Amino acid sequence: MSTPEFTLGIEEEYLLVDRDSLQLAEAPEALMAACRDKLEGQVSPEFLQCQIEIGTGVCAEIAEARADLRKLRSTVAAEAARFNLAPIAASCHPSADWAEQHHTDKDRYNDLEKDLGGVARRLLICGMHVHVGLDDDDLRIDLLPQFSYFLPHLLALSSSSPFWKGQDTGLASYRLTVFDNLPRTGLPPVFNSWAEYQRNIHVLIDLGLIEDSSKIWWDLRPSHNFPTLESRICDVCPRLEDTLSLAAATQALMRMLWGLKTHNMRWRAYDRFLISENRWRAQRYGARGSLIDFGRGAVVDSTELVEELIELIGADARALGGLAEVERLREIAADGSSADRQRAVRRAALEAGQSDAEAMNAVVRHLIEEFHRDL
């Protein structure tokens, strides 16, 4: 078995807000045209007109991904500013109402709205997807259930959507609550081979129910367009460095699992019922919560789990050039994710005598500042 390249690609979805009202704003065509001109196809509209999606190129290591992602974020921010707009990288706007948004008039999105109805119209959410290059088809299928064990860990550390329509949801990642209303979501099934995966997907394709595997929206999936495994579990992160830490961890986890395979070993694939419990705990409590360590048979705080994770994948992260980024996960576990920071901003605003609406606007200003901080 040849050694995979473990190339890296990162996709992020942003919301556009008016700098004065701090409410969502639709992307002007002139803004999209300017971004397309400067970013050569690395930016595109998303389902809703207030959203914008970017994607890095194929990166050999995390340093290359950092440079590309910083360029993408900087360009979008600079072009948006020309229209008195600002991007925010949070999975839900704190106070916006999905019913007031309009979807992008493209065949793909028109078909999606027609197919999914009101479920699609509620998709006022943004995510972050990480692709890791694995050329071997069967290897990608083999790693699906093994990597799934770690999906809740990544979700907890990325959580950035505590608010929905002006209310504190009590969750760290409300985005997942909205997204799970779609069909063909959640943890991936277990397949024994690439051929078995293809047979199952083609049942739906051959019946005309879906066009292709891009309509499969599992938390982790073989990409339809690239020879990659695509992790889709994460909320989008306001801070550039948080995104890079999670991407580096995803890349190192893939290499670690491949390394086990080369020694005729594998990570235990726990039942989806059990992984789903951790997925819920991550969704509910975020980076300052706790998850089940099934090997130990105990509920363990995130700070301790992150230490275990760094020990587990540290050598692989070093080999890939991303050890510093992976070690930075300690800061997220100790200080909290964006969901914790957003709640702290709102709490401080309310304690200062601001109204609920003013407090939510303070959260949006905070998200704008965090987006621009590392640029």
Curated annotation (Swiss-Prot):
Function field: ATP-dependent carboxylate-amine ligase which exhibits weak glutamate--cysteine ligase activity.
UniProt cross-references to NCBIfam families, sorted A to Z: gshA_cyan_rel, PRK13515.1
Pfam entry (one): GCS2
Domain of life: Bacteria
Swiss-Prot/TrEMBL catalytic activity: L-cysteine + L-glutamate + ATP = gamma-L-glutamyl-L-cysteine + ADP + phosphate + H(+)
Protein name: Putative glutamate--cysteine ligase 2
Cross-referenced InterPro entries: GCL_type2/YbdK_subfam, GCS2, Gln_synth/guanido_kin_cat_dom, YbdK
Molecular functions per Gene Ontology: ATP binding; glutamate-cysteine ligase activity
Lineage summary: Bacteria, Pseudomonadati, Pseudomonadota, Alphaproteobacteria, Rhodobacterales
One BP annotation, GO: modified amino acid biosynthetic process
Broadest EC class assigned to this enzyme: ligase
Alphabetical keyword list: ATP-binding, Ligase, Nucleotide-binding
Family: Belongs to the glutamate--cysteine ligase type 2 family. YbdK subfamily.
EC number: 6.3.2.2
UniProt xrefs under PANTHER family: GLUTAMATE--CYSTEINE LIGASE 2-RELATED
